[in-house]
Amino acid sequence: MASKSVTATISSGKIKGRLDSSGRIANFRGVPFAAPPVGALRWRPPAAVEPWSGTRDCTKFGPHAYQRAAGFELFFNTLIEGLGLGAVRKRSLQAALKIAKVKQSEDCLQLNVRMPAHADRLSRKLPVMVWIHGGDHTDGSGMEPLYDSNVLAERGAVFVTINYRLGMFGFLAHPELAAESPDGVSGNYGLLDQIAALEWVRDNIAVFGGDPDNVTIFGESAGGEAVLNLMTAPRARGLFHRAIAQSPSDSGRWLHLRRPALDFSAAEDAGVEFANEVVGSPGGQLSRLREMSAEQLTTHYQQLPLLGRHFYPVVDGVILPTTPMSAFSAQQQASVPLMIGYNSDEATLFADLMHPAGGEFYRDVRQGSVEPMSAGEAREAFARSYPTAGHVDRLM
C-alpha cells in the first residue's frame, strides 16, 4: 500500500511529508532550518532560510555534511558485526549503511521530524526529543538509518534529528574569520548550527503537535559532548528544558581560541597551520579557502592523521565561554535536569579497527589521541599499561 502524503506549514513555507505504511507515524525529512552555508556563508554563523512558495517536498533525507565517510562506514560495519544479528538482518543493515556512497554536501543544514500521525490535532502538546548525533565532531548525520526508528513517536513523542557542520567546515578557527565576526571569535559554526536547529524547534514544533516548552536534547559520544556544550552556551538558554548526555568525553576535548591546552595547539594556530598547507603563505587566506570547492578542501582534510584532526568545539569566551567541566564546577550551566552516563565497554566497538593497521594504529592512538588529551599521572599510567604495540589486545 502506498504511503499517504501529509503537509504542514512552517515559518519558511509549506512542506510535504509522508505517513509510514502503518498510517500511524508521520515523517518529514530534509527540512531546512538554515540557509545553505556555501560560498560567502562558508564559516559563518547559520543564516535564515529563504522562504519558498508552493509546497516543498520533504519526503526524502537530505545529504550528509562533508565528513570522513569511509572511516564511518567501517565503524558502523564493526558495530553491526557485534550485535549478534542473523545473517539476513546483518546483510540488510550493512547494505543500508553504505556511508561512503551517501551524498555529501555543504548544503546539509536540515532536520527530520517524526511524530504520531495527526499529533497536531491532539488537545495536548507532545514532548519533543531532539537527537544530536555523535562521530567525533567529524562524522555522522541525523539522516543515519540507525536513527530511522519509530520507537519514540510510537510512545507519544515528537522526535527530531538534526545535521550540523562537521570537521573543518564546522569548527575551523582562523584570525581572519575572527576579524570579520562581530564577536571577534571563530570556530564554533557546528555548535551554532545546533543552536539554530533548536531555535527552529522553538518556532515550529507546535505545528507538528510538539510542545516548545518541553524539549529534551540528547546525544551520544560527540553528541553527548554537544549536549554539555549547549548547557554551557549562553545563546542556547531557554531552547531546551531537559538534557541527556550519553557517553560524553571527559577528556577536555575542547580547543581554546588563542592559547594552547595540554598538547593541543590553540584553535586559531591549528587553523592557520591548515590554511598554510592548503593555500600557502599567510595573508588573504580566507578568501582563497572560500574560493576552493568543498571536494578540494575535503581532500586536504582527509590527508591529516586520523586522530590528529584538531577541529573541535572552541572555548572562545563568547559562544562557548568556558569548558563544560568548568561551567558545571562553577554552577554556570543551564539550570535544567541532566541525565548523564556511559555505555559499558564502549571502546570495544573500536577494537576490530585496530587489527588491520596493528602497531601503526596503536602509535596513532597514543600520539594523536591519548597523549594530547592526557597529562601527568594519567599519561604515565597509560604508557605503563600499554607500553608496546604487542599489547593492543589489552584494549579489547
Feature-to-residue mapping (PLM):
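Active-site loop->helix "elbow" adjoining a glycine-rich segment at hydrolase catalytic centers
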Residues: 134, 189-193, 221-224
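Substrate-gating cap/lid region and adjacent catalytic-acid/histidine neighborhood
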Residues: 242, 254-257, 288-396
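A short, hydrophobic beta-strand element of the alpha/beta-hydrolase
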Residues: 217, 244-246, 341
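Short glycine-enriched nucleophile-adjacent loop
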Residues: 224-236
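Alpha/beta-hydrolase fold nucleophile elbow
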Residues: 208-220
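Alpha/beta-hydrolase active-site loop
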Residues: 108, 183-206, 263-269
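A conserved short beta-strand
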Residues: 237-250
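Non-catalytic accessory segments of hydrolases
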Residues: 2-188, 212
